[in-house]
UniProtKB/Swiss-Prot annotation:
Keywords from the named record: Acetylation, Mitochondrion, Phosphoprotein, Tricarboxylic acid cycle
A GO cellular component entry from the record: mitochondrion
Name of the protein in question: Alpha-ketoglutarate dehydrogenase component 4
InterPro entries referenced in this protein's UniProt entry, alphabetically: Kgd4/YMR-31
Organism: Bos taurus
Keyword Phosphoprotein: yes
Record-level Gene Ontology MF annotations: protein-macromolecule adaptor activity
Length: 103
C-alpha cells in the first residue's frame, strides 16, 4: 500500500513541474509593427492610393497591368528548379475537373 502512495506522489510532482519551451521567440513587444505605407515606400512600390488615382485618371499604363504581384515574382518562378515548379495540368485532367469527377 505504501508503494502506491509513493508512485502517485511522484506523478503529482511530474505533472506540476513547469514546462520549459525548447523554442525561443524574439520579444515582439520591443519591435513595433511597421506601417503598411512605410513598407511600400521603402520597397519602392507605389502606394495603393496613388495607383488608384493614376488608374482612375484614364492613364492605363501597361506596367500597372503587368505587375499585379511583386515585381520580381515572374523572374523568381523562371529560376526555380523543375521539382519546385507547378506541374502542368493535362487536358484530360482539366476535363475531369470541369465535369465534376467521373462520369
Amino acid at each position: 500500500m505504501m508503494g502506491s502512495k509513493m508512485a502517485s506522489a511522484s506523478r503529482v510532482v511530474q505533472v506540476v513541474k513547469p514546462h520549459t519551451p525548447l523554442i525561443r521567440f524574439p520579444d515582439r513587444r520591443d519591435n513595433p509593427k511597421p506601417n503598411v505605407s512605410e513598407v511600400l515606400r521603402s520597397a519602392g512600390l507605389p502606394s495603393h492610393t496613388s495607383s488608384i488615382s493614376q488608374h482612375s485618371k484614364g492613364s492605363k499604363s501597361p506596367d500597372w497591368l503587368m505587375h499585379q504581384g511583386p515585381p520580381d515574382t515572374a523572374e523568381m518562378i523562371k529560376t526555380l528548379p523543375q521539382k519546385y515548379r507547378r506541374k502542368l495540368v493535362s487536358q484530360e485532367e482539366i476535363e475531369f475537373i470541369q465535369r465534376g469527377g467521373p462520369e
